[in-house]
A protein has these predicted regions:
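Gly/Ser/Thr-rich helix-start
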Residues: 16, 32, 57
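Acidic-residue sensor for enzyme active/binding pockets
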Residues: 20, 36, 43
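A short, exposed loop/beta-hairpin motif centered on an aromatic-Gly-Thr core
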Residues: 25-36
């Protein structure tokens, strides 16, 4: 099973990276590097998915991503 992750530097705290899963908003984390943030977020994702399974709730489908181009002003 795979989920799309967003990993980006926190604009309010330079040097802090955030990782989150749009399909599972409860699963997110941060770290000093993109890799560290993603590793922590993956742990959170596994915990959330285990909880959903244990409580008989359906697992959310992943999101669909698209890139949108615009003319820079």
């Amino acid at each position: 099973m795979t989920y799309t992750a967003l990993v980006y530097e926190d604009p309010e705290t330079p040097g802090t990276w955030i990782a989150e899963f749009p399909a599972i908003p409860e699963a997110h984390s941060f770290g000093r590097t993109p890799e560290e943030a993603l590793a922590h977020a993956k742990e959170a994702l596994e915990l959330v998915l285990a909880y959903l399974k244990e409580t008989g709730r359906p697992l959310p489908p992943d999101v669909r991503t698209v890139q949108v181009g615009i003319d820079a002003a």
